[in-house]
Structures are given as structure tokens and as C-alpha cells.
Amino acid sequence: MINKFLFIQTVTINMATLSKIERRKRMEYFNLNDGNRIPKIGFGTYKLNGSRGVFAIQAALKNGYRLLDSAVNYENEGAVGRAIKNSSVNRDNIFITSKLPGRHHKYQEALEQIQESLYSADLDYYDLYLIHWPNPKENHYLEAWQVMIDAQRFGLIRSVGVSNFEPEHIEYLYRETGVMPAVNQIELHPYWSSKKVREYDNQHHIITEAWSPLQRGGEAFQEKEIIELAQKYHKSPAQIILRWETQINVVPIPKASSYEHQLSNLDIFDFKLTPEEVQSLIDLDKESARRFDPNEHEEF
């Protein structure tokens, strides 16, 4: 004989679990200044290479991520493309990013690299392509930007953006071309909220993305303010940080190879921090926590 109470309880638990999974998959979006839109949270693919990378990226798509962030220097554009091909998610519903390395800032080299990126991933277009670092001492980033604008006109790229750019670098691009980036991906976490760049980006309708959004090493997870908020909202410290970033109009790009962490990082849109709580995390800023100064650091 069926135990009706047990049956009802099991159905209730399963429905609650299903509801939670579906909630994670209901992605929210920011509007870009070029008319396109971008998911409010992305999936970082740094160091996700080969078959392991394909598996992790494919799992991320299954779990509800719709923004995949890669780069030429990550050497995994092929893995990203393979994961997309293996996935049941329609290509048009996935926002795919890659980045131009510093060694290819000159016009012809940059154009060839964009085409090579598309070939490596077996894609017809990128939703977003970024200049990875400005490399101001080399001073070819304007040339690279002009290529990006042309590639957008050719249909190879939907949105053009930059990464690790300071306001003065962006001002130079705009002054010379009249085109503002749609996105600026920068180092950002509770110990470095990058106030100057964030405010500039907001004023110019540029969406800020965060690499290393959880601060490598996890030291921020031990902060009293973050622990108390995690307890209050019944969330993990990582979820508090990621939600904080979306509330300051930042798209975090966390990386997670495990199924559990992938799901957990997405489960952040069912609560909201108060303005005072948002400010309490901004107040954790410390100058020494910044890893790279784009005016000095260069990558090729």
C-alpha cells in the first residue's frame, strides 16, 4: 500500500528542487550601448582546456550559463566551440566572448587573429570580442580598435569591447574613432571594487565585467561582513559576492569546473542586498589587493 504522506512529501521535495534548478536557468540580462544584451553572469573558461574543458563548459551550458568567456591566450577557443556543438542549447542563445592578444595589435595581424579565433571555435561570429590588454608602452591598441570596428561591420563580431582598460585608454579610442566599447572587463572583487573605472563605465553606458570576481585565494570569504550576509540570506560567501557585483552593475565571470559550484554560482537572483550592505562590501577595498596596473602591466 502506498504511503500517501511519503508520496506527497517526495513530490513536494522534487518540485522544490526542480523549481530551484529552473530559477537558476532563468538568466537576467543587461542592455549594451550598441543595442545588444549580455547575461548578468558569465562562465569563465581560463585553464579549462582539452576534453576536461569541453566537459566543464558543456556542463555549464546545461546548468544554465549563457555567457562563455574565452581568449586566444587561454588556448581553449576550440574547446569552447566543441562544447557548444555538443550542447543542446541553440547557438543564438549563447553569448560567446574571446580576446585579442597583445602580440596582434597591428591591423593586419589583428584581423587575421579574429578570423583565426572564429576558425578555432568553428563559429560564424563572436557576440563580443575584446582587446585583452591595452599595452600602452607598445601603443598599438588604437590600431587594434580600428580593426575591431571593421570586423563588427563585416559581421564577424556583434559587440566590440576592451579588457583591463583605464578611462584614459578608452577616451583615446573614442576621441580617434567616435566608438565607445560596449564592455570593459577588469579585475574586480571585494578587495578591489575599481571605483574609478566603474564610475567611468557607468557614465558612458559601458558594461563592466569582472575577472577574478571571487578574489583568488578566497580570503574575502572570511570577512565578517560577508559571513554575516551569507547567514542572513542563507547563501554562501561566493553567492553574496556575486550578487553584490551584479547589483553594482557588474557582470561577474566566475570559473567553476564542479557541477555543484556551477549551479551555486548561478543561484543568486532570488535575493537582493540593501544599499547599505552593498556599500559595506565596497568598503572592503584595499589598494594592495590589486594585482595588475594596466598602465604598467603588459601581456602579449
Regions found by a protein language model. Give the residues of each.
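Acidic (Asp/Glu)-rich catalytic clusters
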Residues: 33, 81-91, 115-122, 174-177, ...
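Acidic-and-aromatic substrate-binding clefts and catalytic sites of carbohydrate-active enzymes
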Residues: 48-51, 70-79, 103-108, 136-139, ...
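N-terminal binding-site loop/beta-alpha segment at the start of enzyme catalytic domains
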Residues: 16-94, 147
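Glycine/small-residue-rich loop that forms an oxyanion/phosphate-binding "nest" at active or ligand-binding sites
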Residues: 104-121, 128-144
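Beta/alpha (TIM)-barrel catalytic core signal, keyed to glycine-rich beta->alpha loops juxtaposed to Asp/Glu
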Residues: 134-300
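A structural motif
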Residues: 65, 123-126, 157, 181
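Short, acidic/polar
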Residues: 49-60, 106-120, 170
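A short, structured active-site edge motif that brings together acidic residues
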Residues: 91-104, 128-134, 188
